[in-house]
């Protein structure tokens, strides 16, 4: 199982603001692009992949939208507007939820009112966490453990205070090269590396 977490610090947690954020300062299109490249391949979708989108621009609780490739049925296509609409439906389903609650949105998609920190604590129990960092070990040379989970961010970098807590959870730093890439591009390179390894 391959897992990915996209920490979208600028992404709003209301569907209206999310949709308005496409192509604007919040850059919510990053969510759709990352979903597309995480879940889909030509004429099909990947098996055994989970992506967690953590939307943090909120007045109450972060929203973690989880998509499981083995369980999705008909998401309606893989173009940007369709995928953003799926995220918007999850946000609509989360209205009125209290802290750390879970709701199923549709087959393969759930929404939780849980923070990035809490999510990665849970994932660390049965996943090896990897954070992308230009100073990390080059992915071609890195040993990738079982149940890898790759941590990504939107255009706002990971807060420095998060590094220490991630280190305590055993997170390893890996690099995809000297250039800063979009999260959706990182996903493609990670999948390609693991595909080559037949992981």
Curated annotation (Swiss-Prot):
It is an enzyme of class 2 (transferase). It comes from the Bacteria. Pfam families: Methyltrn_RNA_2. Its EC number is 2.1.1.-. It is found in: Cytoplasm. GO terms for cellular component: cytoplasm. InterPro entries: Alpha/beta_knot_MTases, TrmY, tRNA_m1G_MTases_N. Keywords: Cytoplasm, Methyltransferase, S-adenosyl-L-methionine, Transferase. GO terms for molecular function: S-adenosylmethionine-dependent methyltransferase activity; tRNA methyltransferase activity. Disulfide bonds: none annotated. S-adenosyl-L-methionine binds at residues 132, 186. GO terms for biological process: tRNA methylation. NCBIfam families: PRK02135.1. Belongs to the methyltransferase superfamily. TrmY family. This is Putative pseudouridine methyltransferase.
């Amino acid at each position: 199982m391959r897992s990915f977490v996209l920490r979208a610090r600028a992404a709003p947690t209301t569907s209206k603001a999310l949709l308005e954020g496409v192509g604007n300062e919040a850059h919510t299109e990053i969510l759709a692009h990352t979903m597309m490249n995480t879940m889909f391949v030509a004429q099909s979708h990947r098996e055994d992949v989970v992506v967690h989108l953590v939307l943090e621009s909120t007045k109450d609780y972060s929203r973690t939208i989880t998509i499981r490739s083995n369980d999705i049925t008909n998401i309606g296509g893989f173009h940007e507007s369709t995928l953003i609409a799926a995220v918007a439906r999850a946000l609509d389903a989360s209205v009125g939820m209290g802290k750390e609650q879970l709701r199923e949105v549709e087959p393969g998609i759930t929404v939780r009112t849980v923070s990035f920190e809490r999510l990665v604590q849970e994932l660390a129990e049965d996943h090896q966490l990897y954070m992308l960092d230009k100073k990390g070990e080059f992915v071609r040379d890195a040993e990738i453990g079982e149940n890898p989970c790759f941590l990504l961010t939107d255009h706002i970098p990971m807060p420095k205070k998060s590094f220490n807590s991630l280190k305590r959870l055993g997170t390893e730093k890996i690099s995809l090269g000297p250039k800063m890439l979009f999260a959706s591009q990182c996903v493609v390179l990670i999948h390609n590396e693991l595909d080559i390894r037949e992981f």
